[in-house]
Amino acid sequence: MFLFSLGGNMYYIAYGSNLNKEEMKQRCKDAEFVSLARLENYTLTYRGNPGRAYLTADKKKGDFVRVAVWDVSENDKKSLDEYEDYPYLYDCFDEKVLLENNETITGFIYQMYDRFPICKPSDSYMERCKQGYRDMGWDASILDF
């Protein structure tokens, strides 16, 4: 059950390549940026297979992941499900995040199944993720493998 925004859409918690504003504009036509936020008790990990590894947010007490919150439509959610290869590669569930204004909201997030090993991503994928970090005004070097 996904929580809906005031406009009737859903809140999507994004990290990785979905921080990239240009890609999100192409992927999710109705998406609107809401806020930067922190996903508490998670850490970023690359998982997958050699040359096909992607970022995921793994549980890790005491750590946090910088994320963006997007207001997305039902059509955007369908597009994201396809992009994230849900439910085969990633699971999707509700999670709480701490917004910049210290409010907490709940949105949906994708997390890769931990059956996939930690693995080095392709340079092109890493660059797309780094562009997203730069788009948000963050230091992209944290994404180096």
Model-derived regions, located:
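Glycine-aromatic micro-motifs
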Residues: 6-145
